[in-house]
């Protein structure tokens, strides 16, 4: 349990999240308009999106399927009967004068997700609901000193709003939840999770209380656009509330905006209640009825999800839970790993993947899909180390060449003459030379100066150009020096 340290004692965080995830779909929720990002302003707007009189919405079946699959991934109940409602409010970039959402009967309810805590335990976060709704357009106030401009390309794009219960007890837990949810959505293929492009946005409902006391008054922080800012926004807002309460003031229930530059939240508007939006069923849309057959079909076609992969990697490949989580955190990395793991030692592969490959990818600022080393060639490199064809040190040189050129490791080893020397007779000859050339060091070692052993190993490696099998060198040197 994390606490906020106030002047009068400790306070608890109470946090609930609302995640707006843009549905991966080529067309919008109720029209056939394209959803391509960064298109020319107002180039992807149908008469439905612009709310022209007489234009009726037509539900996108693919968006419904994406919501069902996401609900299944969240271990939630898929409601066979759900209804679209009109949420009435006025924004200039909302042409209809209302948003089509689901208030009374959402498509998904009562899910769960487990997240790791600071103690290493797993904590269950309850998902209250997932509902479908349409996005608004975008208002631009910096294009002219006299006018505001409206871009309706985003208007009508399908969103899944995923709402948690107030089960989150620290900024770090909130960040873990969003990271894990984003990864799940990417595996399912229902949202790309790109927070920079706005295809995943996070609102945080935050209150504070003394341990054991009732819930306090909450404030909602809108449109937090990165994992780092989730932590910053929650920390600032919780401290702001603690300072107010400790000075004898009350918390006003309101909606606030987080400023990433200043690291502060500011008042946006007083918090609305459901009554303010005058929800009522949309008369232009029939209730959504979902069959058991459809649910079962979508469930059968779900990909292997992150938690399932972690369990498989720890059981089948004997990886540590930590290593499994690191690999599974990126679907492309997990796919790469699985292709290579079928051809070599998975544990050794993991070590090289998470150290050498990740290091080079970060240095080059590229993703694993852009890497020139194929999974098969990576597996070949691991096998060359495993069967003592090359040493770990030589393997690093080979790996660097592979990363630059994409060449197969066996060809590089052959071209460069890098095969490890593992012949006892050859190594014994070299060791005899080293011992003969360094009588004083031999005498020193035999008189108890054990640290000199590293000197002898270094001399053997020098004479063999670094190609000597280090395990054999250690073994043979010990035998020679102790005789």
From Swiss-Prot:
It is an enzyme of class 6 (ligase). GO terms for molecular function: asparaginyl-tRNA synthase (glutamine-hydrolyzing) activity; ATP binding; glutaminyl-tRNA synthase (glutamine-hydrolyzing) activity. Keywords: ATP-binding, Ligase, Nucleotide-binding, Protein biosynthesis. Pfam families: GatB_N, GatB_Yqey. NCBIfam families: gatB, PRK05477.1-2, PRK05477.1-4, PRK05477.1-5. Belongs to the GatB/GatE family. GatB subfamily. Heterotrimer of A, B and C subunits. This is Aspartyl/glutamyl-tRNA(Asn/Gln) amidotransferase subunit B. It comes from Rickettsia peacockii (strain Rustic).
